């Protein structure tokens, strides 16, 4: 059993692709180059604990997982958890402002216009007053909502694990339209893609390996493109697409990462993920992030990659034995990412070199969140950690 006490450590035994091609021997190379495995020596101190808050008592559970993420506005931190309780906390101390039972949460709430838009595991979009926690309205969909909704000037758009995209009025919650993707009869991977809104189009993907662009006003299909490659199962598009310039970047567990023309869906390039040492790896992408110049991709079993916008690999660090990845986060020169069975990694985003590592004892499945110079991350035991980030 893993220890329950958190550990903060420095550089890990993770070697990037550049080192695999030849670099000076160092003590960090004593470990398996592709394993998520910390070893000495310690590296740089980039985080210090500010406070922590227990959202749920999960000490007696075997291998629990928490996917909820925080959202921060001014001096308040908002967060839910699998326990069903939702909290507003003082950012300075972690003290409770108010709490409300809304149902299990596996994503970040979206603050907008004095309201909080929250997706729940029972398929409800719940809207609360951000100051008081009073419920304004809720809309019930037919599948668990595991990605944050997107709030526009007049609509709230969200997706769920039933391969649905739903748009409702942002003020009243009145139904506007719904699009249903085809769900395969075979088993699919856990999770689903969120929605990316760009102008008048909404981009998302489904468990059948299809990426679609929907018209925002009607939900009708502008185009659809298969990202399945040659796979017959486990072809899920579970990472939320990213729009940069005239391209949309997306991924599937069977096809790797794609760049497509955002207006037509035409594939510009594709980078498949595969490792000869791991022929059974799903390669399911936990998330995409970009600084506008590079893409950062976390793929199950295979590691975290940095790509340029033409699909060339800049570096790679391994994740074998680390568990499922969450979406990476960019902060200044750093890249932050978490692995479900290992913890939180803080790396130099230019090289992939890990600078610091935080292991709460039970791994981290949730995406980290950065607000200003504060880092917030939820452990699998339901503890929200607030760090000062340097």
Model regions and ranges:
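C-terminal motif of bacterial Sec signal peptides marking the signal peptidase cleavage site
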Residues: 20-22
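Blade-level signature of beta-propeller repeat domains, shared across WD40, Kelch, NHL, RCC1
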Residues: 360-390
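Short loop/turn segments that connect beta-strands within beta-propeller blades
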Residues: 90-93, 129-132, 169-172, 215-219, ...
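Extracytoplasmic beta-rich repeat domains
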Residues: 26-35, 42-71, 96-112, 135-152, ...
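Structural signature of WD-repeat beta-propellers
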Residues: 81, 120, 160-161, 206, ...
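Loop/turn-rich, solvent-exposed surfaces of beta-rich toroidal or solenoidal domains
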Residues: 294-305, 309, 316-346
